[in-house]
């Protein structure tokens, strides 16, 4: 199945303009996700706590190399939290999260 984001197109430019006007802090990136179906709005939210079960399939490419694809099922560990990306998406909102890209564990370097 191939994803169809045609319905999301009208939202891309306004979100991009808002993010550029807002600016970014050091080591920040922004994660934007679109809900399936009708979009009712946009929400800034935090990432939901959860985990993937049965998450990777192993494949072999034409050259004999190994690669993995993500699959499985996401388990939401806080389904009643209304300030998360998963809640926003489940309720028709575009979810936006500010994410830190420096994943270095403090005290290890």
Kindly label every feature range from the protein language model.
Residues 3-109:
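Electrostatically charged, flexible surface regions
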